[in-house]
Amino acid sequence: MTMSLITIAVELTPGKEVRSAIQQGLFDANVKATGDGHFDAVCVTARDADATVIGGVVGEAYWGWVNFTTVWVHPDHRRQGIASRMLKLAEAEAARLGYTQAYLDTFSFQSPDLYLRAGYEVFGQLDHFPAGAQRLFMRKTLLSQMPEPMSGNTPQRDIG
């Protein structure tokens, strides 16, 4: 039996192909272990009168859960309930797609009360991340009710 040489090294600037190979390898292993490679993207945006994106929620959904990875509102539009409404609509979309649970992580300086008011509970915390702050991990069971879209229009879906 011939043993091939394996080199293990730090790559300071890994290219897209390196990251893609690693991510695809993990994805393939997960599909093999679970038999389920289904994935849905959830995205809700808020736009101003000029159709400029002034906020959004981005989520990745699989295995019954949606992970809201990004929730953002432009500073000029904060404290108007936009984040709450977008989050509620994103949760409803995930529920419509069949997902029953949501999770996210946030920092103590990123308005964690928004998520607590929305019914999320903290299930983990990392102190001093960054120094003087905490990173909070939250989860919620989703309800299957559809909130009103922000503009009164029906949600748009990018099919394709």
Give the residues covered by each predicted segment.
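Conserved short alpha-helix immediately C-terminal to the canonical SAM/SAH-binding motif I
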Residues: 86, 110-111
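Conserved GNAT acetyl-CoA-binding A-motif
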Residues: 94-107
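Acetyl-CoA-dependent GNAT
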Residues: 6-69, 74, 109, 124, ...
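Conserved active-site tyrosine of GNAT-family acetyltransferases
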Residues: 22, 115, 120
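Conserved catalytic-core motifs of GNAT/GCN5-like acyltransferases
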Residues: 103-105, 121-137
